[in-house]
Amino acid sequence: MSFSPLIRQLIDALRTLPGVGQKTAQRMALQLLERDRSGGVRLAQALSLAMEGVGHCRQCRTLTEQELCPQCADTRRDDTQLCVVEGPMDVYAVEQTGYRGRYFVLKGHLSPLDGLGPDAIGVPQLMARIEEQGSFTEVILATNPTVEGEATAHYIAQLLAEKGLVASRIAHGVPLGGELELVDGGTLAHAFAGRKPISL
């Protein structure tokens, strides 16, 4: 079946979403056009507003509509702990554990094969934040328990050790190869409670 140019454009746009292939994108497009045009209009408006109105927090780099996210703007949070995560979804996952410290969001993990080195994911900005804040006594490395996440945590731990700072790693109650955003709050809370210093 050959789709019109506008329908093809909609299908291609839907395929940019994670986990959405050609067939799923076709079903979504046809569902919106055939059965839920008002839902499609709401989706387009919400997407347009979010793309224009959502940016990154100037301190932790998570997604927010303000200059500072709610976590960074909250003066009651613990200024001695900094939790380093790979992405904004991980902040939401860690918040479910009751963690009350500060955050820093990397833009992924180290992956030399994909051209992602320390500069690409924001390690220099992380180190600058730690130096500027000056109050962190513990940096919790909550990168995903994947090979790349472990390598990222180890690299950052080495940089912190050179500055005499304590780095800890969340415990492995989180399944190896898993991603934080997919882990339930209880498992993640257990992993946080069992975190251990990284030995170099």
Swiss-Prot record:
Keywords: DNA damage, DNA recombination, DNA repair, Metal-binding, Zinc, Zinc-finger. GO terms for biological process: DNA recombination; DNA repair. Residues 80-175 form the Toprim domain. GO terms for molecular function: DNA binding; zinc ion binding. InterPro entries: DNA_Rcmb_RecR, Rcmb_RecR, Rcmb_RecR_Znf, TOPRIM_dom, TOPRIM_RecR. A zinc finger (C4-type) spans 57-72. May play a role in DNA repair. It seems to be involved in an RecBC-independent recombinational process of DNA repair. It may act with RecF and RecO. Belongs to the RecR family. HAMAP family: RecR. This is Recombination protein RecR. The gene is recR.
